[in-house]
């Protein structure tokens, strides 16, 4: 198993190290355009092996040839958000970056699974799919896993319970229009509505929607990377180990939930073939409307990129 990570910034480097520590591949390759950065970070990670108790080979390069014959490629490349910048502000610049990255990846790997992290996530997943020529099941966006992790952590903090006992789904686009689904949120099987007031739930939902912005505002010059990296690795682990995990991920919808030809976050089964099944769960009318609205915003942004992808 060979996994390449494109982008040696905070998310990419953190994910690469986590992949190595969990020994999910015999080789992890870190690629970046800045000379010395992927090489130095990869060497530093490799030297942590004796202490971290892993034998994964880790290499850094500025040449996409190093990614040749990758089974999975994690794409994190792109510009980071700055305070006051929305994901949509990043749209055109990152779309060009992701198209170029995908073109380079596909020159050297014939049928990889692409896991997308670059923002705006849903639109960048669309760009990667359009540029790669891969089947829709092999291009997956990391959105709901991260958003659900934030929602779960906030609930656990509020109730003073273990995060492991909190289950939640967050659907829709990875942005302000995301849809935390309260109906399927529980703590050790107990519906969240029996444990928290509606007012408190609404506050936690709103905090989840602004989870990325909250961190950006603290950091001033940067954005979240520990949780995004961990979320991407959780998806990759499900693929590598064929675990058939049910996770909320961005995938191409073709009629599911009444949504057509849009990449949007929904519950899917993740295994060795990527997205192996899209699950259509029952949503309250307001939640379904919110999901469709979220998808429509993604579709609008995708249409603005038609010239770039022509």
From Swiss-Prot:
Principal EC category: oxidoreductase
UniProt keyword annotations, A-Z: NAD, Oxidoreductase, Tricarboxylic acid cycle
E.C. number: 1.1.1.37
Disulfide bond annotation, renumbered to this chain: none
HAMAP family, A to Z: Malate_dehydrog_3 (MF_00487)
Amino acids binding substrate: 81, 87, 119, 150
A Pfam family recorded for this sequence: Ldh_1_C
CDD domains: LDH-like_MDH (cd01339)
Family: Belongs to the LDH/MDH superfamily. MDH type 3 family.
NCBIfam families named among the record's database cross-references: MalateDH_bact, PRK06223.1
UniProt cross-references to Gene3D superfamilies, sorted A to Z: Lactate dehydrogenase/glycoside hydrolase, family 4, C-terminal, NAD(P)-binding Rossmann-like Domain
Gene: mdh
KW Membrane (keyword) present: no
Catalytic reaction annotation: (S)-malate + NAD(+) = oxaloacetate + NADH + H(+)
Species: Chlorobium phaeobacteroides (strain DSM 266 / SMG 266 / 2430)
UniProt name for this protein: Malate dehydrogenase
List of catalytic residues: 174
Domain of life: Bacteria
GO molecular function per UniProt: L-lactate dehydrogenase activity; L-malate dehydrogenase (NAD+) activity
Keyword presence, Oxidoreductase: yes
Annotated GO biological process: lactate metabolic process; tricarboxylic acid cycle
Binding site for NAD(+): 7-12, 32, 94, 117-119
Role this protein plays: Catalyzes the reversible oxidation of malate to oxaloacetate.
């Amino acid at each position: 198993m060979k996994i390449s990570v494109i982008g040696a910034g905070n998310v990419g480097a953190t994910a690469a190290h986590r992949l190595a520590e969990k020994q999910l591949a015999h080789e992890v390759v870190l690629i970046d355009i800045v000379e010395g950065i992927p090489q130095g970070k990869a060497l530093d990670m490799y030297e942590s092996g004796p202490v971290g108790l892993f034998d994964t080979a880790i290499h850094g390069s500025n040449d996409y040839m190093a990614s040749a014959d990758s089974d999975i490629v994690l794409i994190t490349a792109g510009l980071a958000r700055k305070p006051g910048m929305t994901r949509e502000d990043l749209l055109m610049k990152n779309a060009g970056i992701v198209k170029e990255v995908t073109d380079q990846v596909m020159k050297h790997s014939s049928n990889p699974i692409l896991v997308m992290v670059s923002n705006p996530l849903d639109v960048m997943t669309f760009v990667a799919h359009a540029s790669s020529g891969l089947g829709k099941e092999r291009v997956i966006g990391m959105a709901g896993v991260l958003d659900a992790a934030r929602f779960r952590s906030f609930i656990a903090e509020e109730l003073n319970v273990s995060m492991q006992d909190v289950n939640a789904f967050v659907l829709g686009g990875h942005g302000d229009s995301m849809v935390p689904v309260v109906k399927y949120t529980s703590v050790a099987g107990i519906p969240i509505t029996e444990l928290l007031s509606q007012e408190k739930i609404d506050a936690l939902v709103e905090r989840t929607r602004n989870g990325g912005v909250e961190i950006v505002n603290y950091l001033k010059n940067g954005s979240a990377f520990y949780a995004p990296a961990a979320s991407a690795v959780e998806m990759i682990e499900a693929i590598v180990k064929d675990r058939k995990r049910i996770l909320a991920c961005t995938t191409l919808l073709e009629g599911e939930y009444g949504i057509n030809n849009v990449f949007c976050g929904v519950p899917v089964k993740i295994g060795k073939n990527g997205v192996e099944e899209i699950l259509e769960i029952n949503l309250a009318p307001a939640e379904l409307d919110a999901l469709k609205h979220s998808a429509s915003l993604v579709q609008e942004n995708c249409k603005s990129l038609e010239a770039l992808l022509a």
